[in-house]
From Swiss-Prot:
Transmembrane segments: none annotated. GO terms for cellular component: cytoplasm; cytosol; plasma membrane. The keyword Cell membrane applies. Residues 466-468 form a propeptide. The modification Cysteine methyl ester is found at residue 465. It is found in: Cell membrane. InterPro entries: Ald_DH/histidinol_DH, Ald_DH_C, Ald_DH_CS_CYS, Ald_DH_CS_GLU, Ald_DH_N, Aldehyde_DH_dom, Aldehyde_DH_NAD(P). Highly expressed in kidney and liver. In brain is expressed at moderate levels in cortex, striatum and hippocampus, and at lower levels in brainstem and cerebellum. This is Aldehyde dehydrogenase family 3 member B1. Pathway: Alcohol metabolism; ethanol degradation; acetate from ethanol: step 2/2. NAD(+) binds at residues 188-193. Oxidizes medium and long chain saturated and unsaturated fatty aldehydes generated in the plasma membrane into non-toxic fatty acids. May have a protective role against the cytotoxicity induced by lipid peroxidation. Short-chain fatty aldehydes are not good substrates. Can use both NADP(+) and NAD(+) as electron acceptor in vitro, however in vivo preference will depend on their tissue levels. Low activity towards acetaldehyde and 3,4-dihydroxyphenylacetaldehyde. Able to metabolize aromatic aldehydes such as benzaldehyde to their acid form.
Length: 468
């Protein structure tokens, strides 16, 4: 028996009845999300600490505040985003109304991962609600404490005839994907992304895939190694390295590596103390499966910093590896943990060639005091996002779209990009029922004179002149 069919049908009926269409309804649901975040802040922080040993600071910065900012932005701009967008016309349509209408797709499925379970639930949900859709949320069963709050508490703040949270693991997700949705938004790894995309293809359902990959970080010789180390260590070991946009490896010269390793040690000690295992600021690996996988990667290359682990606590020390070969496992898969390999190159050209013979990453980073070096890396590579001389700070700007390219994903969201992702851009032209004489130019019998006049009339004009 299909346990989802009845609820999905209820959501479809709610959408058909137009319940989610009005600006007032959308704003009320967004206000509900805002109240959910404010009323349950401590509970959310405790759940994130339980799941990931995430500090209150990291929970606020990367989960709660970002989600709240997205809600606030959508509330401020909702009516302007919803407005029909007027477009330029040609001579033949100067007296007509041409516009793009942003209409909701209908029933949307959002599948959420475990590493940022609040952020990666609420940020796409804001876009789906603002665009006027009904939504099915599927949180990760791996982040159990957060899943419980999303399932039991979040629905109280939303209209449950238009939104629902479903629970379960791989089997339940597979059953859910057998149903036809009007849009699917998935965040996770590429392997599961292919499964989701194949399921969507059966119904020709449009889809956004937010995946991952091995994000490179190039460090030029002219950099201050301590400044680079501070910034790299922060965004590599943030959330215990379980971040899809974290740098997966550093490319630098042998000389820079010799300067960078002690600087990284200084940064790690400054951030997490002499014994990082006792630091309240360092997260833990999500479960035993991922812990075992990461523990296996510690045997690659040579451990220059860290390397300690404790299975009972799912703790892996902030680690730096050197003398790493490109063929080793740590360079063949996304690490998704607090391990940072350093790979030496002889030149910028070699570094760029190294990056370009791999799949396009979700993010790419470059450090240099010379702007032309940053611009070269930007011009000669491709990635979902790029940041020069820092880590994932580009993620803090809702004015920038977030997403991957190639195997790191497809589609964009954040800010208005989320609204656009969950909206059908409907092309509309409203013509006059009269003035039929003008249309004689296009009707048979055809003539060369009529063709010339019609081609001129069909040229796009930016002016507002209404003379024919």
């Amino acid at each position: 028996m299909d346990s989802f069919e009845d609820k999905l049908q209820q959501l479809r009926e709610a959408f058909k009845e137009g319940r989610t269409r009005s600006a007032e309804f959308r704003a009320a649901q967004l206000q509900g999300l805002s109240h959910f975040l404010r009323d349950n802040k401590q509970q959310l922080q405790e759940a994130l600490a339980q799941d990931l040993h995430k500090s209150a600071f990291e929970a606020e910065v990367s989960e709660i505040a970002i989600s709240q900012a997205e809600v606030d932005l959508a509330l401020r701009n909702l009516r302007s985003w919803m407005k029909d967008e007027k477009v330029s016309k040609n001579l033949a349509t100067q007296l007509d109304s041409a516009f793009i209408r942003k209409e909701p797709f209908g029933l949307v499925l959002i599948i959420v991962p475990w590493n940022y379970p609040i952020n990666l639930t609420l940020v796409p949900l804001v876009g789906a609600i603002a665009a006027g859709n009904c939504v099915v949320l599927k949180p990760s069963e791996i982040s159990k404490a957060t899943e419980k709050i999303l399932a039991e508490v979040l629905p109280r703040y939303l209209d449950q005839s238009c939104f629902t949270v479903v629970l379960g693991g791989r089997q339940e997700t597979g059953q859910l994907l057998e149903h036809k949705f009007d849009y699917i938004f998935f965040t996770g790894n590429a392997y599961v992304g292919k499964i989701v995309m194949a399921a969507a293809a059966k119904h020709l359902t449009p889809i956004t895939l937010e995946l991952g990959g091995k994000n490179p970080c190039y460090v030029d010789d002219n950099c201050d190694p301590q400044i680079v180390a501070n910034r790299v260590a922060w965004f590599r070991y943030f959330n215990a390295g379980q971040t899809c946009v974290a740098p997966d490896y550093i490319l630098c010269s042998q000389e820079m590596q010799e300067r960078l390793v002690p600087a990284l040690q200084n940064a790690i000690t400054r951030f997490y103390g002499d014994n990082p295992q006792t630091s309240p600021n360092l997260g833990r690996i999500i479960n035993q499966k991922h812990f075992k996988r990461l523990q296996g990667l510690l045997g690659c290359g040579r451990v220059a910093i860290g390397g300690q682990s404790d299975e009972g606590e799912r703790y892996i020390a902030p680690t730096v590896l050197v003398d790493v070969q490109e063929t080793e496992p740590v360079m063949q898969e996304e690490i998704f943990g607090p391990i940072l390999p350093l790979v030496t190159v002889r030149s910028l050209d070699e570094a760029i060639e190294f990056m370009n013979r791999r799949e396009k990453p979700l993010a790419l980073y470059a450090f240099s005091k010379r702007s032309q070096v940053i611009k070269q890396v930007l011009a000669r590579t491709s990635s979902g996002g790029f940041c020069g001389n820092d880590g994932f700070m580009h993620m803090t700007l809702s004015s920038l779209p977030f997403g991957g390219v190639g195997t790191s994903g497809m589609g964009r969201y954040h800010g208005k990009f989320s609204f656009d992702t969950f909206s059908n851009q409907r092309a509309c032209l409203l013509r006059s029922p009269g003035m039929e004489k003008i249309n004689d130019l296009r009707y048979p019998p055809y003539s060369s004179r009529n063709l010339r006049v019609l081609l001129v009339a069909m040229e796009e004009r930016c002016c507002s002149c209404t003379l024919l």
